[in-house]
Design a protein with these regions (language model features):
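Alpha-helical recognition segments enriched in aromatics with Gly/Pro capping
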Residues: 99-102, 109-207
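N-terminal Rossmann-like or analogous alpha/beta NTP/dinucleotide-binding catalytic cores
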Residues: 1-105, 198, 205
Length: 207
């Protein structure tokens, strides 16, 4: 069996969640006021406090790549920001929208009663502030591929493509496996339940 597996072509993907919104400011960062002023924005939309790269996200990505290169193994680096904004995820995002009800039936039983009331697989990126919004989506239009969300009493409509929204992480995890045809991903023991859930979502998407 091991001899057979050794002959199967494979790729190793390193994926950066650099479209995630900044939740808190690390203590060991210089010029931390830059980060404090950009809480909630994607890491790649925040200026680099080290002032070396175009964004904080790019700085982190470069550090990760340089670290991995020291081990002399081949890997493919992928950026969440790039894949969302360049439309690489668009077909999969459309699939998530098509399977919205199935995904909700998988996720909702795992949430508390209050969280169930506001949960949506999609997180809009506010066109006014640039922040990743963890707020209720009030309308979903599967035909036109749009969402409506309520931002402090103001209803905003957005389509789901090209980085105008991102997915909640468990759905995002499954969507990546679906997009890149991933058969195995390493994860820690603390993520076992999340991985089981994401696997169910991936199957719902059609993998």
């Amino acid at each position: 069996a091991l001899n057979h597996i050794n002959k199967i072509n494979s790729e190793l993907i390193t994926f950066s969640d650099d479209l995630d919104g900044l939740r808190k400011v690390p203590e060991n960062i210089p010029n931390d006021k830059i980060l404090h002023n950009n809480i909630g924005k994607p890491l790649t939309s925040i200026p680099d406090p080290f002032k070396k790269y175009a964004s904080f996200g790019e700085h982190n990505n470069k550090m990760l790549i340089e670290f991995l290169k020291k081990f002399n193994f081949n890997f493919i680096f992928k950026s969440s920001t790039e894949n969302y904004k360049k439309g690489i995820f668009n077909n999969s995002l459309e699939r998530v929208l098509e399977k919205f009800d199935d995904i909700m039936s998988i996720i909702l039983p795992t949430l508390g009663s209050e969280r169930r009331k506001t949960y949506s697989p999609f997180l809009p990126i506010c066109p006014e502030t640039g922040k990743v919004l963890e707020i209720p989506v009030t309308e979903i239009d599967k035909k036109n591929k749009t969402l409506v969300f309520d931002n402090d009493g103001k209803k905003i409509k957005t389509d789901i493509f090209n980085g105008k929204c991102k997915l909640q992480w468990k759905v995002d995890w499954a969507m990546r496996w679906f997009t890149f045809d991933v058969d195995f991903e390493m994860y820690g023991k603390d993520l076992t339940e999340s991985a089981i859930l994401s696997n169910k979502i991936c199957r719902a998407l059609g993998k």
